[in-house]
């Protein structure tokens, strides 16, 4: 698959793209702006691999891959990974880091909707992590992910719940008090309630299998997966073979 630039960018927020392009050079700095992503990556990788019955030999699409943190970790598990993003700078960082690390990943600058038009039913696993809250039309992304996965395949989403606790934890706490991520990273209006996400899933051939919360304890400085989806949460869906 050739890396190419999409010209049909109806579901792209240029302001969101600019935010991530501004800090792209520090994507792989373990103590930089993306430190939380590096910290949670082993948790989400293990959860994805567990519910996908392993990743070895599978064709995987990472939607909203950014600088490639999750993409690389899945490739190291033996997956054949394509990373999809609309940010030119993060993709350049991802390509260079993969080259330096000796990992083979195909990074493509394209919207998920256009990719779905060209590669429907081509992937065993689709991941869309920490991306839905950064696009104008997350429902469209969910539908595109459902189109891209093969019957019998798995699709994983993660995002932030929309409520007062999430605002306090993810914006006031993480951006202003603890300064875990840059100010302005998130917009509470773009957060997505689990019921909304699952309604979009129900409009597709996907069916919910698992939902789990991602929790941070500022006293221990540790992340964990546990029940409770008040703030960050992940959803595993499966596309039935008969659909």
Curated annotation (Swiss-Prot):
Family note: Belongs to the methyltransferase superfamily. UbiG/COQ3 family.
Pathway connected to this protein: Cofactor biosynthesis; ubiquinone biosynthesis
Name of protein: Ubiquinone biosynthesis O-methyltransferase
Positions that bind S-adenosyl-L-methionine: 44, 64, 85, 129
Organism: Erwinia tasmaniensis (strain DSM 17950 / CFBP 7177 / CIP 109463 / NCPPB 4357 / Et1/99)
PANTHER family: METHYLTRANSFERASE, UBIQUINONE BIOSYNTHESIS O-METHYLTRANSFERASE, MITOCHONDRIAL
Domain of life: Bacteria
Alphabetized Pfam families for the sequence: Methyltransf_23 (PF13489)
GO terms of molecular function: 2-polyprenyl-6-hydroxyphenol methylase activity; 3-demethylubiquinol 3-O-methyltransferase activity; polyprenyldihydroxybenzoate methyltransferase activity
Keyword Nucleotide-binding: no
Record keywords, A-Z: Methyltransferase, S-adenosyl-L-methionine, Transferase, Ubiquinone biosynthesis
Biological processes annotated in GO: methylation
Catalytic activity annotation: a 3-demethylubiquinol + S-adenosyl-L-methionine = a ubiquinol + S-adenosyl-L-homocysteine + H(+); a 3-(all-trans-polyprenyl)benzene-1,2-diol + S-adenosyl-L-methionine = a 2-methoxy-6-(all-trans-polyprenyl)phenol + S-adenosyl-L-homocysteine + H(+)
Enzyme's top EC category: transferase
Annotated InterPro entries: SAM-dependent_MTases_sf, UbiG_MeTrfase
Underlying gene: ubiG
Role this protein plays: O-methyltransferase that catalyzes the 2 O-methylation steps in the ubiquinone biosynthetic pathway.
E.C. number(s) listed in UniProt: 2.1.1.222, 2.1.1.64
């Amino acid at each position: 698959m050739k890396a190419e630039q999409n010209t049909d960018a109806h579901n792209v927020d240029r302001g969101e793209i600019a935010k991530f392009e501004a800090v792209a050079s520090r994507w792989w700095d373990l103590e930089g702006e993306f430190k939380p992503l590096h910290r949670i990556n082993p948790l989400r990788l293990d959860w994805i691999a567990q519910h996908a019955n392993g990743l070895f030999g599978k064709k995987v699409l990472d939607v909203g891959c950014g600088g490639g943190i999750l993409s690389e970790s899945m490739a190291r598990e033996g997956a054949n990974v394509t990373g999809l993003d609309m940010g030119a700078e993060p993709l350049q960082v991802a390509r260079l880091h993969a080259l330096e690390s000796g990992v083979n990943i195909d990074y493509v600058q394209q919207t998920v909707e256009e990719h779905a038009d060209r590669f429907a039913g081509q992937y065993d696993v689709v991941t869309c992590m920490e991306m839905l809250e950064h696009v104008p039309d997350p429902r469209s992304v969910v539908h595109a992910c459902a189109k891209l996965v093969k019957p019998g395949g798995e699709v994983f989403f993660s995002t932030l719940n929309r409520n007062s606790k999430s605002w306090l934890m993810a914006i006031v706490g993480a951006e202003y008090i603890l300064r875990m991520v840059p100010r302005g990273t998130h917009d509470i209006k773009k957060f997505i309630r689990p019921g909304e996400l699952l309604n979009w899933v129900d409009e597709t051939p996907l069916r919910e299998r698992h939902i789990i919360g991602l929790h941070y304890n500022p006293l221990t400085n540790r992340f964990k997966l546990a029940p409770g989806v008040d703030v960050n949460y992940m959803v595993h869906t499966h596309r039935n073979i008969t659909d």
